[in-house]
Amino acid sequence: MRTRVIVNGANGKMGILACETLENHEQFEVVAKLSRQDNLGQSILDTKAQIVVDLTRADCVYENSLTIINHGARPVIGTSGLVETQIDELTKLCKIKQIGGIIAPNFSLGAILMMMLAAKASEYFSEVEIIEGHHQQKLDAPSGTALKTAEMIAAARKKPKNKLPLKELTLGARGGSHHDINIHSLRLPGLLARQEVLFGNIGETLSITHNSIDRRCFMPGIVLACQKVLNLTNLVYGLEHLL
């Protein structure tokens, strides 16, 4: 028996590839391909979907996630834009419902390894900044990957960090700050997804960079998330917990 999956946001570039990947996988059956005009909750009931892969937009991902959980399906969220308070609320809801779920700031396994390496390196470097770049159709900033990277670094850091008393001559010149880590966001044609984590110590720097050059790099992570989520009874934030 194949696992029944809905792809929400199926008409986008990521959604089209996700549908193609899951349809060609022996473990899954794509029972609905939804776009913004479709009723997500009703589709879950009609198809008895076990998993909903959400690849929509930042302005609707929270409501979509609530709908998925409240209708008894397991969310696999690949849409950025969720803030920490929303993730906390979704975590509580999954616990109450005893439903597994996954929020993946990035489905690329290479990007996950980059984040894990950055967290490890932060134990030995006192200073770090994040530079992320995406295509111009990505309208939220910073990226979910950058936010998650900052959170992983902040959790792992042992050395004190300096907050330099600089005066910005142009507002925002030093980027935004998340967990006291500066993040700089680029939105340029020619980019798909790129992130550099740049560390500095006295007399040396260390750069950890990941480039996504084709959206197909995200597909193994989507398959992994759909395979693992059925065995979860809680919400997991980040694919690094599944590797």
Say what each PLM segment does.
Residues 74, 89-108, 126-128:
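Rossmann-fold dehydrogenase core element
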